[in-house]
């Protein structure tokens, strides 16, 4: 669950933005900036809450920075996203130099009181950080918003036919900026979780390609929240399996684990493209 949570959070944010017709390839850079922002804020203030708020704010800020070019100026989305990824990676490395080796304050024990004492199940399911449970609650929430509410219908309409949505009086740029802001908040929370809870430390490039994996997961899950959840936990489970195998002396090449999400995405796209029913459903 720990390894899957950052992937799931980022992927759900990306999914909503892509449903509105925006592809943000800057996820890796935004996650890095959010990770260092959360780490800096926590070290300086001694409060994890302030750290998470700072990370979410930076995630939204960088997502809207991308929106200026991709939505406002109608620049090429792929080029703009790659620019944000490179910029975020370089800037985070520079401003994070003084914080390498910095010590975080002690935090309260994770888990749900009493339930985390249940044998086996308690440690597996009820001893996690609250962000893990938040990410799980977001799955049905995002699904309900997109497929059972009028604003969600508008978001999907903007993504599928922006000219028709504009003709009906909806502001396509505003809706896309709103979905990007939500996406930035999710990506920011994901980055903060990595630097404050999962690791917890700051190292240059610590996101280690998770932003790209989250992008691949959205395609792997065919833009459906529950399928994205399955993909995130599948690849998160593979990461933990690799660590457990290494701990008992079985060596698994890290390159294999790294390439698995992309290979699986290519296979899924190939299968969908060969089946007219799947194309219609997705």
Name these PLM-found stretches.
Residues 29, 33, 49-57, 78-82, ...:
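Hydrophobic alpha-helical transmembrane segments
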Residues 89-148, 248-257, 281:
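Transmembrane helix-bundle core of multi-pass membrane transporters
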Residues 198-262:
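Transmembrane alpha-helical segments in multi-pass inner-membrane proteins
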Residues 1-10, 23, 37, 44-51:
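Membrane-interfacial amphipathic/re-entrant helices at transmembrane-helix boundaries
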Residues 10-11, 35-39, 89-93, 134-144, ...:
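Hydrophobic core segments of alpha-helical transmembrane domains in multi-pass membrane transport
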């Amino acid at each position: 669950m720990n390894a899957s949570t950052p992937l799931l959070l980022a992927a759900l944010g990306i999914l909503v933005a892509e449903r509105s017709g925006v592809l943000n390839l800057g996820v890796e850079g935004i996650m890095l900036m959010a990770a260092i922002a959360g780490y800096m804020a926590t070290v300086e203030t001694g409060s994890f809450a302030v750290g998470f708020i700072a990370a979410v704010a930076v995630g939204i800020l960088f997502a809207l920075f991308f929106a200026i070019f991709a939505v406002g100026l109608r620049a090429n989305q792929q080029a703009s996203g790659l620019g944000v990824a490179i910029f975020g990676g370089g800037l985070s490395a520079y401003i994070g130099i003084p914080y390498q080796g910095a010590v975080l304050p002690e935090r309260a024990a994770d888990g749900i009181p009493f339930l985390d004492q249940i044998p086996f199940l308690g440690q597996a399911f009820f001893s996690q950080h609250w962000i893990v449970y938040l990410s799980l609650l977001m799955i049905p929430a995002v699904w309900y918003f997109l497929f059972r509410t009028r604003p969600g219908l508008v978001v999907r309409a903007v993504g599928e036919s922006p000219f028709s949505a504009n003709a009906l009086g909806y502001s396509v740029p505003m809706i896309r900026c709103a979905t990007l802001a939500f996406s930035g908040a999710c990506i920011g929370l994901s980055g903060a979780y990595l630097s404050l809870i999962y690791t917890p430390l700051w190292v240059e490039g610590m996101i280690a390609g998770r932003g790209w994996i989250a992008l691949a997961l959205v395609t792997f899950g065919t833009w459906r929240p529950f399928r994205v959840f399955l993909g995130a936990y599948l690849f998160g489970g593979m990461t933990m399996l690799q660590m457990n195998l290494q701990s008992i002396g079985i060596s698994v090449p890290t390159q294999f684990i790294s390439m698995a999400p992309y290979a699986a995405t290519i296979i899924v796209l190939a299968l969908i493209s060969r089946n007219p029913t799947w194309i219609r459903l997705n």
